[in-house]
Amino acid sequence: MTGPGAPLISVVLPVGNVADFLPACLDSVFGEPGQPGGDLEVIAVDDASSDGCGHILDTRAGRDPRLRVIHLTESAGPGPARMRGLAEAAGTYVWFVDPDDLLAGGALAAVTGRLASCRPDVLLIDYLIRRRSGRTEPSPGAALLAVPPAAAATLTLAERPALINRTMTAWSKVFRREFLTGLRVCFPPGIHEDVQVSCAALLSAERIALLDRVCYVYRRRRHSFLATTSMAHFSIFPAYESVFALMDAGGNPAGPGGPAAPGGPRLPRVSAAVRAAVFGRAIEHYSTILANGLVPRRGRREFFHRMAADYRRYRPAGYQRPPGLRGMKFAVIERGAYGAYRVLGPLNNARAAMARAWPARRAQPAR
């Protein structure tokens, strides 16, 4: 339970061998002028780093009492490190920040202001993508965060199903801590560990708030987990399969390959529009992994057919494919036509590249 005097936000950093990036991340969190000290605690979980991250954290903690460092003796990966940090957090809200990324200037002030004004279960924030060249670009679907002047302060996924198309990352959301722990879902080991938590939170939340300001800078790194070509990307399938099981069970979450968790929350009835949006998001996520060359060549055909099987298994009744090239891609996936998919892939990639080159609006950092 959150007690008197507890901070408003607990920032949780799962730290694993990112010494080249960690100081800048810490500066972005602690260096914001005018941030009330009592509103913030930072819990850094050193995931048995071997590159000096532990020393960087301990040195910083000696200068700033808002930072608490937990050292793990064996590396468990970012998912379990987040869970350890969550267990130690005292804040009303928790924000999982990756230590190779940055908070944008003014982010904490903007976030705390929105949290205080509408007390949501989940706050969705905007972000910038910083590529290795240093070039930045706005987040895909940033327009989804726009709030009409007369709109209510919070909403549900049923009211705006397209919100499921925002990134599945944990760092793009600020969670009410007791709401999150009440979901009885966890960040598992491995990659794509954010998917089940993100989906369960959005499906369950009665109060979702939107912050149409850039609060986070996501660094695209060559050697990050999600940018590495690996058979580990097959873990995306059990991640989404657990989400479909969650919707079918009415909100009693099951971990990938595991039984339903007793005592979990009951989801509101999942509308046809929400189910269709989650389905489309899953298929698009699968196909993006394949299109970006993240699956080794030897596993691509198998990955495609696993995607096609999920398409046929989870396609909602009456589902209408999207228009244009994306709809053609979905049709080819449904048929399991790998050869046609390989031909269509470059066209879809060109469409996506054009969308990135001509964004609907230019995102601005929070200030």
Question: Model regions: which residues?
Answer:
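A conserved acidic beta->alpha catalytic loop
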Residues: 28, 46-56, 74, 103
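Cell-envelope/extracellular polymer assembly enzymes that use nucleotide-activated donors
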Residues: 7-10, 41, 196
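Donor-binding/catalytic cores of nucleotide-activated saccharide
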Residues: 78, 99-211, 216-231
